[in-house]
Amino acid sequence: VATDGKRFKPHLVSKIINDDGSIVKNFQPSLEGSLPVSQENLDLVQGALKAVTKEGGTASSLESLPVSVAGKTGTAENPHGRDHGWFIAYAPAEKPKYVVVCIVEQGSYGAVSAAPIVKTILEYLFADENKKVGK
C-alpha cells in the first residue's frame, strides 16, 4: 500500500561501508511484483490510513510529528489473557522512507500500547534526519 502496490525485495540495510568510508556494497530497490489493485482503490486505502493519525483517528497522537504518517492500529484477541495491541505506520505518508511495526503482547489496544512506541521511534528517526541536514 505504501508503495502504490509495488512489491520490492526487502533489505535490512541500504549499503555496507568500510571503516575508511568506502562503500563495499550498495543495495538498490528491486521490483518483485505489484498488486492487482486500481490506483483509485489504493488512493482510498492510503487516505484511510492517513486519517488514522489525524484528529479523530485511533492514533491521532502521531499528528504532532514533523511529517505526515499513515498507519493502522489493531487488537489481536488472546484467549489466554489480555489482548495484544499492535500498530504499523509508514512515513512520510506521501513518499515513505520508514515503516515501523510494533506489537505489545497483552497490551490491550494498539492505540494505547503500540502507537506511542511507534511515535517515539519515528520521532527519533526524523530528529536524527533533521540533524543531518542542519534543520
Where in the sequence are the language-model features?
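Extended C-terminal subregions enriched in glycine
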Residues: 36-50
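Active-site beta-strand/loop architecture of penicillin-binding DD-peptidases
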Residues: 1-32, 49-134
